[in-house]
């Protein structure tokens, strides 16, 4: 019995990859899951304010993991999981590799976004030399304080929610969701997901993005 459903945001709850437009059918499916007793949690590289607002307005009860695992919200309390990245280091990274900072960086503390999203070996070396983590979601580069990655945040959320791995479902589209999938008992990759994610998923869905969310929730509720 699945008690908690973890869902990514961009490319998963949206109408497609590469758009910010949320799929209305997917949102209705999340509400059906909640009404059936499955708590829904948002797990994303997005900033805490964005996810907290969505969590509230969509009527979700499972909490959230923001900034790629660096912040967790559950039961009205927010927890920091990752180390803080100094603002001057963020600016140095952008300048060194000629990157554009995300508009959300103003509201971030431990995980910062940049475009273009292409990850290069010299970026990884630069981050490692400073005790940081850098990864690409396919939408943006993310520079994070350690431990970085969705896995640490999801583990904290499951602990707070008192939910076991086998009682947890997860759905996503990006290689950055692999860590989240490792913490869930049943996992689903939408049809337009990264190949790396499909290889580790329990289920490869027939439908893309938001339509895939509807497909997966139908499976869970059947």
UniProtKB/Swiss-Prot annotation:
One of its GO terms (cellular component) is cytosol. It catalyses: 2-phosphoglycolate + H2O = glycolate + phosphate. The active site is at 8 (nucleophile). Substrate binds at residue 150. GO terms for molecular function: magnesium ion binding; phosphoglycolate phosphatase activity. It comes from the Archaea. SUPFAM superfamilies: HAD-like (SSF56784). Its EC number is 3.1.3.18. Keywords: Carbohydrate metabolism, Hydrolase, Magnesium, Metal-binding. Mg(2+) binds at residues 8, 10, 173, 177. Its cofactor is Mg(2+). NCBIfam families: HAD-SF-IIB, Pglycolate_arch, SPP-subfamily. Catalyzes the dephosphorylation of 2-phosphoglycolate. Belongs to the archaeal SPP-like hydrolase family. This is Phosphoglycolate phosphatase. It comes from Metallosphaera sedula (strain ATCC 51363 / DSM 5348 / JCM 9185 / NBRC 15509 / TH2). The lineage of its organism: Archaea, Thermoproteota, Thermoprotei, Sulfolobales, Sulfolobaceae.
